[in-house]
Amino acid sequence: MFSRVFVRAASNAAKAGVKPPVKLFGVEGTYASALFTAASKETSVESASSSLVKLSSLIKEDAKLKHIMENPALSTKDRAVVVDSLVKSSANLDKPVVNLLKVLAENNKLGLFDKISSQFSILNDAHNGLIRGSVTTAQPLDSKNFKRLEKALQQSSLVGQQKTLKLDNVVKPDIKGGLIVEVGDQTIDLSVSSKIQKLNKVLEETI
């Protein structure tokens, strides 16, 4: 029942020209995108985001609740009880978010809530003109180099006009050196490990 209601709301919003600002992938991305379109039509993106943050905080603070939500063996009845408990514990939740919880309970996907919430935050950032990006390096970048790179990316076509870049430094020693830049759904791989892989491929093809 709630699956149909949730999907119908998202579908109506899509027909009205409401589309997520960035394309997400995977099951979590699909749910997050559907919530974005439904919230845009019925309430607001800000309201949905606020409710998700509230619920995420509640779940994070209750280890037992988190464990229960991630239990795939939970019965349909018990999943419904969990949702009712969440709704009662969090006053004035956004309606599309409540419908999302019920859909997740129906489909035994409550364990995906945290990931869906995380994916929705990406949509919310983009909706507010904030583009997320990351630069992966073998060792942490010092503040000076990080700011120089952030400024260069902010002014590049990867970010675009009237957008603000939110850049994080991800450390992965296995890339050996160089860096990997990811902005939105675009990736620039300048890592040493990537160059080694390309060299190995060339060598294999010539042998």
Curated annotation (Swiss-Prot):
Source species, domain of life: Eukaryota
Pfam family, one: OSCP
GO cellular component, one term: proton-transporting ATP synthase complex
Gene Ontology molecular function, alphabetical: proton-transporting ATP synthase activity, rotational mechanism
Keywords: ATP synthesis, Hydrogen ion transport, Ion transport, Membrane, Mitochondrion, Mitochondrion inner membrane, Transit peptide, Transport
Transmembrane segments: none
Database matches in Gene3D superfamilies: N-terminal domain of the delta subunit of the F1F0-ATP synthase
UniProt cross-references to InterPro entries, sorted A to Z: ATP_synth_OSCP/delta_N_sf, ATPase_OSCP/d_CS, ATPase_OSCP/dsu
PROSITE patterns xref list: ATPASE_DELTA
Function in brief: Mitochondrial membrane ATP synthase (F(1)F(0) ATP synthase or Complex V) produces ATP from ADP in the presence of a proton gradient across the membrane which is generated by electron transport complexes of the respiratory chain. F-type ATPases consist of two structural domains, F(1) - containing the extramembraneous catalytic core and F(0) - containing the membrane proton channel, linked together by a central stalk and a peripheral stalk. During catalysis, ATP synthesis in the catalytic domain of F(1) is coupled via a rotary mechanism of the central stalk subunits to proton translocation.
Family to which this protein belongs: Belongs to the ATPase delta chain family.
Protein name, per record: ATP synthase subunit 5, mitochondrial
Lineage, broadest ranks: Eukaryota, Fungi, Dikarya, Ascomycota, Saccharomycotina
This protein's encoding gene: ATP5
